[in-house]
């Protein structure tokens, strides 16, 4: 924040003495810094105009302007007078006020942040990209002040914001590259300007992808939205990123994780209304199978399956030499099967239904072995049983004549079929569509509706579907069921909490407890529901506990509204026992 004092402007060692400048001025036959043939009077007037602006003595260009002025024969007296009269000491006044604030007890860091944030807001408000580009061009090289600025997080953040607002500014584009060259590319993920420069974009892409892959599922959820937004900035960035991930996905070590990230980015692009299906197919194995590529591309672009294209694929995948199964393992394509086969009220031409079922089952169950880009075996052992399970559940789910009571009679059949992952996903989608109907819970008489009971079975059989089950339960828990009275709403929410406790008991512990902790902190959930959850959880858990679980769950128990309000039978008090166990076995962080 400190500014240079007026009396310490010139450093003779660096800028040369006044005499040397005078010699240059006398040697007019030598190179003219201010331009060959330029009129001395005009140069003097231009320089005097600059000297008369406020605080010009603080400008980085002061020395160059002085040099031009003296070379044009300017008088030192005029310079001294103008610079002195127009010196208002804005920077020094800020420093003085900052010192006063610190002396009154304000933390120095807080003072610095206040000054910097105010300066940032002023720069963003008054930034002129044309002036910035002209100053940059005049410098002829990277200004020292710019290199100093990018060394600080505050000013890098300023450049990111300015670059977003002024993507065509050459000075900002160059600055973003400088920041990337300095090793800060991990910060640039949200800057669209970075997407215009291949060198910067490739660095940012590499750093961002490494960050996602190193952190597992939790890191994926945290960083994917920003990563996907950057990749989907334009067709060129999407193609470049997907091509790179397509190559990395072939690696034995970590290839499947990269493929997952690529598929999540495809989903993001689709949700934003972009049709990237042709790029997806071109980067896969579809290019070698033009008929299959055409059929897939047509359905993906329209967002719907159709009998003609399904028939093309069916013939190819029932032939003696079918295409690679990877061809139809496109998440967006499989989602279309979920809608066609499991959505209530969906209509499929009965003559073609077996083709739909066969292709979905084939994608879900067939295992291929490849060596040196050549397929050496196709294992179809589970194809028939998977097809049968999909068909059975499809007939149950899409039969509008079957009510809840009829479904109860078919529960054992449903439970058997749910053991197949693809069927479990279909049932989960079907349950979501069914219970999301506004009048669904109004018509239920059972304490635990059969559709919610199916979620328990899915949680038991399929760990990979735990996040989707919790997502559905949270959505239902937070929905305003205005058609039910207050007591019915409480009972429904207790039932949903019971499903969450079951999910917790099957291993999805931290996400469930984290959600309830947030409910308690936001104060938007009836406290009796939190007590119900705590009671049920204490009933199913036992030592040893992980530190992460204790740090999340213990504060819920110690909350004033929870502690001492849970009734227990006899001498057994699980709340007190849990708290005592934690305090004796863990170092608790407040």
UniProtKB/Swiss-Prot annotation:
UniProt entry keywords in alphabetical sequence: Nucleus, Repressor, RNA-binding, Transcription, Transcription regulation
GO CC term (a single one): NELF complex
UniProt-annotated location(s): Nucleus
Main location: nucleus
Gene Ontology biological process terms from the UniProt entry: negative regulation of transcription elongation by RNA polymerase II
Acidic residues biased stretches: 21-43
Pfam family, one: TH1
Ranges where the record places region Disordered: 15-43
GO molecular function, one term: RNA binding
Highest rank taxon of the organism: Eukaryota
Role of this protein: Essential component of the NELF complex, a complex that negatively regulates the elongation of transcription by RNA polymerase II. The NELF complex, which acts via an association with the DSIF complex and causes transcriptional pausing, is counteracted by the P-TEFb kinase complex.
Subunit (UniProt): The NELF complex is composed of NELFA, NELFB, NELFCD and NELFE; NELFA and NELFCD form a stable subcomplex that binds primarily through NELFCD to the N-terminus of NELFB. Binds RNA which may help to stabilize the NELF complex on nucleic acid. In vitro, the NELFA:NELFCD subcomplex binds to ssDNA and ssRNA in a sequence- and structure-dependent manner. Interacts with ARAF1. Interacts with PCF11. Interacts with NELFB. Interacts with KAT8.
Membership in a protein family: Belongs to the NELF-D family.
Protein's UniProt name: Negative elongation factor D
Natural source organism: Sus scrofa
């Amino acid at each position: 924040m400190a500014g240079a004092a007026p009396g310490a402007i010139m450093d003779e060692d660096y800028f040369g003495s006044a005499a040397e400048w005078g010699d240059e001025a006398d040697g007019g036959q030598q190179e003219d810094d201010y331009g060959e043939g330029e009129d001395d009077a005009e140069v003097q007037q231009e320089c005097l105009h600059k000297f008369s602006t406020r605080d010009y003595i603080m400008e980085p260009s002061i020395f160059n302007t002085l040099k031009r002025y003296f070379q044009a024969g300017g008088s030192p007296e005029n310079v001294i007078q103008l610079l002195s009269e127009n010196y208002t000491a804005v920077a020094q006044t800020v420093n003085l006020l900052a010192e006063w604030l610190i002396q009154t007890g304000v933390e120095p860091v807080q003072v610095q942040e206040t000054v910097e944030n105010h300066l940032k807001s002023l720069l963003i408000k008054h930034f002129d990209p044309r002036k910035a580009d002209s100053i940059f061009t005049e410098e002829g090289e990277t200004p020292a002040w710019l290199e100093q600025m990018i060394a600080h997080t505050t000013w890098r953040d300023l450049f990111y914001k300015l670059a977003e607002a002024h993507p065509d500014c050459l000075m900002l584009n160059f600055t973003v590259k400088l920041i990337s060259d300095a090793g800060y590319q991990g910060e640039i993920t949200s800057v669209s300007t970075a997407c215009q420069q291949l060198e910067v974009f490739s660095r940012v892409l590499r750093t961002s992808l490494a960050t996602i892959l190193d952190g597992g599922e939790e890191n994926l959820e945290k960083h994917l939205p920003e990563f996907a937004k950057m990749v989907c900035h334009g067709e060129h960035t999407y193609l470049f990123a997907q091509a790179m991930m397509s190559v990395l996905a072939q690696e034995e070590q970590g290839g499947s994780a990269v493929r997952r990230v690529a598929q999540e980015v495809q989903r993001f692009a689709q949700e934003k209304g972009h049709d990237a299906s042709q790029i997806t197919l071109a980067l896969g194995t579809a290019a070698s199978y033009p008929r299959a590529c055409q059929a897939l591309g047509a359905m993906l672009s329209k967002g719907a399956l159709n009998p003609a294209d399904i028939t093309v694929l069916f013939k190819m995948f029932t032939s003696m030499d079918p295409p690679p199964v990877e061809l139809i393992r496109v998440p967006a394509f499989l989602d279309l099967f979920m809608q066609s086969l499991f959505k209530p009220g969906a209509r499929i031409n009965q003559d073609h239904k077996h083709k739909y079922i066969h292709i979905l089952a084939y994608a879900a169950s067939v295992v291929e072995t490849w060596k040196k880009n050549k397929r050496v075996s196709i294992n179809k052992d589970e194809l028939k049983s998977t097809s049968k399970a999909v068909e059975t559940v499809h007939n149950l789910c899409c039969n509008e004549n079957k009510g809840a009571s009829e479904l109860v009679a078919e529960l054992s059949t449903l439970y058997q079929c749910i053991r197949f992952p693809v069927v479990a996903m279909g049932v989960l989608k079907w349950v979501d569509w069914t219970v999301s109907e506004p009048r669904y819970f109004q018509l239920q008489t059972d304490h635990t509706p059969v559709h919610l009971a199916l979620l328990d079975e899915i949680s038991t059989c399929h760990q990979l579907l735990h996040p989707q089950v919790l997502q559905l339960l949270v959505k239902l828990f937070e929905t305003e069921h205005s058609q039910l009275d207050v007591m019915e709403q409480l009972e429904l929410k207790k039932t949903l909490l019971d499903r969450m406790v079951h999910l917790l008991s099957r291993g999805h512990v931290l996400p469930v407890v984290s959600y309830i902790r947030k409910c308690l902190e936001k104060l938007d959930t009836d406290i009796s529901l939190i007590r119900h959850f705590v009671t049920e959880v204490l009933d199913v858990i036992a030592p040893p506990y992980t530190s992460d679980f204790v740090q999340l769950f213990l504060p819920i128990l110690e909350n004033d509204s929870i502690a001492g309000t849970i009734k227990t039978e006899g001498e057994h008090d699980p709340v007190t026992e849990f708290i005592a166990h934690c305090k004796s076995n863990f170092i608790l962080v407040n």
